[in-house]
């Protein structure tokens, strides 16, 4: 009886993390969409358009996750949900990287070049590919982790070398560090058991997609003054 209650409580925590992430994604999409319509600065509008797309796409997949959880009840296949995330990530992560590069490039008055962006996205897809192989047991999880972090390091090195190293001030360094930290934590969560992994992925999605999107809104609208 005690074990049954514990399992139900643990599952309720996972379900709640899905619900709250979905709500925050829809909130972020609303805020960034309104700001994209309001601003008259083209580069900022492009960034908010991307952030809106990211939140809507991720929100759509979270609606699928929530529907599966509600339909399956106590027999949720968490591993299947973990695998479905890769479809979400294959669409949203390139958009997130493009948005990051646009913000960083805009701050140093440069353009985002196709060659650099293509290399970053190819490394991103390689990282996702080996992650999926580990998720489906087609590759050992530790080998997948090692190869994935190699691609991750190469990807963020390109971003740093192109857009952060030459920047003046701390804006680009702070944003780059936030992205680097949150994205690297996905690699740690990847090694957890399924329920804890899904909770961590949900929390990290909240930061990577919601908090970053809302943070950019605060940054560009200057609604919070730093004395």
Each model region followed by its residue ranges:
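Polytopic alpha-helical membrane-helix bundles and their juxtamembrane interface segments
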Residues: 7-87, 93-227
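Hydrophobic alpha-helical signal peptides and transmembrane signal-/tail-anchor segments
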Residues: 1-5
């Amino acid at each position: 009886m005690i074990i049954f209650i514990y399992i139900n409580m643990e599952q309720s925590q996972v379900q709640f993390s899905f619900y709250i992430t979905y709500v925050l994604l829809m909130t972020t999409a609303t805020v960034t969409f309104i700001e994209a319509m309001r601003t008259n600065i083209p580069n900022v509008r492009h960034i908010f358009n991307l952030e809106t797309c990211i939140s809507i796409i991720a929100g759509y997949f979270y609606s699928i996750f929530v529907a599966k959880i509600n339909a399956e009840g106590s027999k949720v296949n968490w591993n299947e949900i973990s695998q479905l995330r890769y479809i979400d990530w294959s669409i949203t992560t390139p958009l997130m990287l493009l948005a990051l590069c646009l913000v960083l490039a805009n701050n140093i008055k440069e353009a985002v070049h196709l060659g650099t962006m293509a290399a970053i996205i190819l490394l991103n897809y390689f990282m996702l590919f080996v992650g999926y192989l580990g998720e489906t047991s087609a590759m050992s999880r530790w080998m997948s982790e090692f190869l994935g972090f190699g691609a991750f390091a190469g990807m963020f090195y390109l971003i740093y070398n192109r857009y952060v190293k030459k920047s003046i001030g701390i804006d680009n360094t702070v944003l780059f560090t936030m992205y680097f930290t949150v994205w690297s934590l996905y690699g740690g969560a990847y090694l957890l058991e399924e329920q804890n992994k899904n909770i961590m992925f949900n929390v990290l999605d909240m930061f990577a997609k919601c908090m970053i999107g809302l943070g950019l809104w605060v940054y560009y609208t200057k609604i919070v003054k730093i004395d």
